[in-house]
Swiss-Prot record:
SUPFAM superfamilies, sorted: Zn-binding ribosomal proteins
GO molecular function, one term: structural constituent of ribosome
Listed transmembrane segments: none
Family: Belongs to the bacterial ribosomal protein bL33 family.
UniProt xrefs under InterPro entries: Ribosomal_bL33 (IPR001705), Ribosomal_bL33_CS (IPR018264), Ribosomal_bL33_sf (IPR038584), Ribosomal_zn-bd (IPR011332)
Keywords for the protein's UniProt record, in alphabetical order: Ribonucleoprotein, Ribosomal protein
Alphabetized PROSITE patterns for the sequence: RIBOSOMAL_L33
Origin: domain of life: Bacteria
Annotated Gene Ontology cellular component terms: cytoplasm; ribonucleoprotein complex; ribosome
One GO term of the biological process aspect: translation
Protein name: Large ribosomal subunit protein bL33B
Protein species of origin: Staphylococcus aureus (strain NCTC 8325 / PS 47)
Length: 49
């Protein structure tokens, strides 16, 4: 079962991206390096509730 998750920048807190994940294969929170337009660089983005 795939669910939509929101990714938030760990440095500025902006919620920049929406993606999907499979809860059965990835029960923990998703972390990805993505581009943050406010920081103007690649930062770590984590799944929010």
């Amino acid at each position: 079962m795939r669910v939509n998750v929101t990714l938030a920048c760990t440095e500025c807190g902006d919620r920049n991206y929406i993606t999907t994940k499979n809860k059965r294969n990835n029960p923990e929170r998703v972390e990805m390096k993505k581009f943050c337009s406010r920081e103007n660089k690649q930062t770590l983005h984590r799944e929010t509730k």
